UniProtKB/Swiss-Prot annotation:
Enzyme Commission no: 2.7.7.56
Family: Belongs to the RNase PH family.
Protein name: Ribonuclease PH
Role played: Phosphorolytic 3'-5' exoribonuclease that plays an important role in tRNA 3'-end maturation. Removes nucleotide residues following the 3'-CCA terminus of tRNAs; can also add nucleotides to the ends of RNA molecules by using nucleoside diphosphates as substrates, but this may not be physiologically important. Probably plays a role in initiation of 16S rRNA degradation (leading to ribosome degradation) during starvation.
GO molecular function, a single term: 3'-5'-RNA exonuclease activity
Pfam families named in the record: RNase_PH, RNase_PH_C
Positions annotated to bind phosphate: 99, 137-139
Catalytic activity: tRNA(n+1) + phosphate = tRNA(n) + a ribonucleoside 5'-diphosphate
Length: 250
């Protein structure tokens, strides 16, 4: 049964942390967290903490050589004890998991959506997103933090005179939404994510355009009305995240 946004927001909260259904977890962006990267940000979304660094490489992948444009790409990983039990480093296993590959491709796609790669010149902006502590929403936090790290790296390039124009056309941020106990909720933590009937990750630009929507039923189905309600919550949450990004850069 579909639920209107108004009905969803008017009922009392049933969330473990007592949050309203449209409330983000406490969110912060700490810039300049590491010394050497051209851009670095520690993003905290509740108990999810991700270190995002942006490195400038004066080269491009072979398929872009001689074309006069740059590239933005990403890698993603989790520290062995980012979760309740220790996991082996993927380097020790000798291969990345399918999940890791999917997430880092998502981060790269999301950042490229708001870059004019021609203005970047023949260089690569390489984003590394390392999860220090995971409590749900790590890919969304990575995208939101990586954009700020990228903005700092671009600002440094412009300050050095390496770029004449800013290649970043817009902000980009991401948030999760889902159906928990029959209700649409924003910014799921691990407890909610483990129990949800539907899980949707939404990536949007600062101007309100969708970059990507990843949605799945978790042993259940959801209606078009429920999807619309979840997307409405995501739009509101991402607007708040974009404001936080812009405030962090001031």
């Amino acid at each position: 049964m579909s639920t209107s946004a108004a009905d969803t927001l008017s009922r009392p909260s049933v969330r473990p942390a007592g949050r309203a259904v449209d409330a983000l977890r406490p969110f912060s962006l700490e810039r300049g967290f590491t010394r050497y990267a051209e851009g670095s940000v520690l993003v905290r979304a509740g108990n999810t903490h991700v270190l995002c660094t942006a490195s400038v490489l004066e080269k491009v992948p072979p398929f872009l050589k001689g074309r006069g444009e740059g590239w933005v790409t990403a890698e993603y990983g989790m520290l062995p004890r980012a979760t309740h039990t220790r996991g082996d480093r993927e380097a020790a296993r000798g291969k990345q998991s399918g999940r890791t590959q999917e997430i880092q491709r998502l981060i790269g796609r999301s950042l490229r959506a708001v870059f004019d790669l021609r203005l970047l010149g023949e260089r690569t902006l390489h984003l590394d997103c390392d999860v220090l502590q995971a409590d749900g929403g790590t890919r969304c936090a990575s995208i939101t933090g990586a954009w700020v790290a990228a903005a700092d790296a671009v600002a440094l390039l412009m300050q050095r005179g390496d770029l004449a124009h800013n290649p970043i056309r817009d902000a980009v941020a991401a948030v999760s939404v889902g159906l928990v106990d029959g209700r649409a909720v924003l910014d799921l933590d691990y407890q909610e994510d483990s129990a949800c009937a539907a899980d949707v990750n939404v990536v949007m630009t600062g101007s309100g355009a969708f970059v990507e929507v990843q949605g799945t039923g978790e042993g259940a189905t959801f209606t078009r009305g429920e999807l619309d309600t979840m997307l409405g919550l995501a739009e509101g949450g991402i607007a708040q995240l974009v404001r936080a990004q812009r405030e962090a850069l001031q």
